[in-house]
Amino acid sequence: MINKKKLVTSLVTSSLLATFTLGSFADAHTYIINNEDINKNAQESSIGTLKQNNFKQSTIDSMKPRNLQSFQEDKVFKAPKEKTPITERARKSENALSNSKLNDVRSFTTVNMRTNENERTAAKLKYNGKNTNVWVADNYITDKQAKNIGEEFDNKIDPLVKEKFGEPSDVDHDGKVNILVYDIKDDFETTGSYTGGYFHPRDLYDVPHSNKAEVFYMDTYPSMGTDKNNLNEKKVYSTLAHEYQHMVNANQKLLKEQKEDGMDVWLDEAFAMASEHMYLQKPLDHRIEYYNNSTSIANGHSLIKWNHRGDVLSNYALSYLFSQYLSAQSDNGDKIFKEILQDPANTSEALENAIHKHVDPKMSLGEFMTNFRVALEKKEATGLHGFNGAPGLNSISPKPVRELPQTLAPQGSVMFETTSPIKVPKDKDEKVNYVKVK
């Protein structure tokens, strides 16, 4: 006999009444509902009532003071509407980054994440390497640390990302990328979340506020630690791999393919975190931890709507796990990332093309994403409902929803438990799929 409190919830215009618990229990019947719509701009599909709240902050508050990295964000910037190429005159300017030598000072346009305003940040060139320049605008970073960052990029990160994703652009014709190391102004002190780094596509064009070169921006505090007198530059190496993927992605989509916008953000971020995973050669535990604790994910957070409900950290967690599921299911492993990136089709079509080639020629993208949601719960060693035994992913632990919503956003999903089997309602929306997992 079950003694726990029960919740009776109406599903889809009273076509189904089921008894749900407020927590897990023995001999439960477990179901996953997924909205298989792959159009991120589509209307939500009907299934029940959701009282929305500040899921992101409630999740952060419940996790403090755990792994700080769980709250790291990567600011996403859209490509500029005007895409004026950088001119030879701009490249030859005495203030161009490409015309710099060691210990030169240049002024960069940076973004204040608190206000979203542009600012000027003066930085000194502290490493002039084969493939990268490291600029420092933080008195707590030593010359040795700047050199360590540059050498790690030149020797490990650069060849890895080029092999797995492709080549960066070279808009200033110097064959290098620039890494600006400074304390990004973010909301860490007030919310606990912070910006670990960013890449801005405007830098690839001759437009207002552009730095007219390949630049990505790396945070010192708190990304390298919360003791400013003892910062650890190694903590941002994986973020370097993350941001570099964004730069390579932008080169492919914006410059080579001449697209108005780049790859859909959710998949671009998935690839960036896959880049981190490959560099570290281990799972991103902080993303798994956030997934396991996320109130918004339990309540139907969308995989493909970026910053859904204002909880971008849940999107990072879902995108990361999707990248690992995709490579686990593909018959060519992580080579599938580069293949998708270099497919000129739109994001959904490129993904489905790769799934047809490397997973199942008859499976739709929506069906693949439903299998992904099931895999998060079942984690089977082989087959569609797991990660093929990939180490470290068995710690994934989705939470059952406490109250079923009436609607799910495109690629939103919930898991729920009942005391007895249910019948799938006949009047559910067409793209809503129910799967019994236990």
Curated annotation (Swiss-Prot):
pH dependence remark: Optimum pH is 7.4-8.5.
CC cofactor: Zn(2+)
GO cellular component: a single term: extracellular region
Enzyme class: hydrolase
Post-translational modification (record): Several different N-terminal ends may be produced, the favored N-terminus is position 102.
Binding of Zn(2+), residues: 242, 246, 269
A GO term, aspect molecular function: zinc ion binding
UniProt keyword annotation of Protein transport present: no
Similarity field: Belongs to the peptidase M30 family.
Compartmental location: Secreted
Record comment: activity regulation: Inhibited by metal- and zinc-specific inhibitors, such as EDTA and 1,10-phenanthroline in vitro. Is resistant to all inhibitors of serine, cysteine and aspartic proteases.
UniProt EC number: 3.4.24.-
Cofactor remark from the record: Binds 1 zinc ion per subunit.
Transmembrane helix in keyword set: no
Source species of the chain: Staphylococcus hyicus
Any one GO BP annotation for this protein: proteolysis
Protein name per its UniProtKB record: Neutral metalloprotease ShpI
Temperature dependence: Optimum temperature is 55 degrees Celsius. Unstable at temperatures above 45 degrees Celsius.
Keywords carried by this UniProt record: Hydrolase, Metal-binding, Metalloprotease, Protease, Secreted, Signal, Zinc, Zymogen
Function, as annotated: Protease that has a low substrate specificity. Catalyzes the hydrolysis of glucagon, melittin and oxidized beta-insulin at various positions in vitro. Is not able to cleave elastin or the synthetic substrates FAGLA (a substrate for neutral proteinases) and FALGPA (a substrate for collagenase).
Active site: 243
InterPro entries attached to this UniProt entry: Peptidase_M30_hyicolysin
Record's signal peptide: 1-26
Propeptide residue intervals: 27-101
